[in-house]
Amino acid sequence: IPTRFWLDVLAKVCGICLGLGYDGALQYDPKDVERVRHIVRKYPSALLWTHKTYIDGFVVPKILFDNNFPMPHFFGGANLNVPILGFLLRRAGGIFIRRSFQDNEIYKLSLKQYIGYLMEKRFPMTWSFEGTRSRLGKLMPPKYGLLKYVLEGAHHAGSQDIHIIPVSVSYDLIRDAEEYAREQSGTPK
């Protein structure tokens, strides 16, 4: 369970990271934020955001934190569980999952049970619906695996009122596009 201290640290890190590549000013509709607040406080909820660049994962938590939301548990790939970052994210509600675990029934069952527990307790959840970033500013095809587990978890937990909230993160400029072009021309990552 996230603690206030680690959520404060994560919010500070999100603000710093957003300021590295962009001016740090996030624009959003306060009316939409209030509508989402009402839903998240009343119903089990999942906020699914678009993923076009590295910093997308910082945008949603920063807006939620700045607007005094109950902070969501967020799903990310196991590749994010690196020293320091993994330590921080876990303590702020991060849940690292493998990219593929089709043959591991115990892993599937454990994940479904944990998601069911989060929904039963009405902890909001968030993740990138595309599963990975596009790096070009375009949307990738959605990955339905985690959403399927959320729906199954809701069913097993008896949660019939789950709300899926789409969140679009847009930019005037995608800085990852230049890096991606270099990688495609043969420059190593």
Q: How would you name each of these model-derived features?
A:
Residues 35, 53-57, 80-84, 103-105, ...:
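Flexible loop/turn segments at secondary-structure boundaries
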Residues 4, 35-37, 41, 90-91, ...:
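Arginine residue identity/basic-tract feature
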Residues 15, 31-34, 68, 81, ...:
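Short, surface-exposed, charged/polar-biased interaction segments
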Residues 6, 41-107, 154-165:
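Catalytic core of membrane glycerolipid acyltransferases/transacylases, capturing the structured
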Residues 22-24, 56, 103-111, 138-143:
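Phosphate/oxyanion-binding active-site loops and adjacent basic polyanion-contact surfaces
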Residues 1-46, 51-62, 86-93, 112-113, ...:
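Membrane-anchoring hydrophobic helices of lipid-metabolizing enzymes
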Residues 69-76, 113-189:
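Membrane-associated lipid acylation/remodeling enzymes share a hydrophobic transmembrane-juxtamembrane segment
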